[in-house]
């Protein structure tokens, strides 16, 4: 797909991976609407990007937003969906575990209510993460959610055809979601990625390149694109 002149609706597009994708798609000539619960945190997102407020978990408001923005060519969700439970499952608060699945419900809402207004040759891109297929201790919640997102995309792809749907799966990425600073931040990423085939954290721009590829390549659907520095193989 030639992105130039296409309308792109991007949830979670005001920080981190989502904002990086918004900027790259806008640089290619796309008309990007970047949506999040707090669009102000994007600051000045740059040319070609319009900011809007929205919550993928609010189905009624989401349907109204899609009607307002329709029609569009590309639908992307990099929204986290809320809090993520971390730690051993057998001592985990089950409300926290359940809340982690807000990401899945949000993605399902985006696909369910957005497809109606998506161009016949349009595409959808979702974001999961390597814990979906390589779950480390303490990652049972995010691993389960990511696995469900990838299975959801594979399962719904035949219904969406000829529209496409794909998932981009990041490894450990240096984004604002990690609240550490200075030497503590550097040490965390260094230790966490020491055994990667590419021994460093990825960048939001590198993951965004995977999202752009999923948009542009018209011969892929129902699959997952890994941008993880070889983490799955380490």
Segments from the language model and where they lie:
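Conserved Rossmann-fold cofactor-binding substructure of NAD(P)-dependent oxidoreductases
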Residues: 57-71
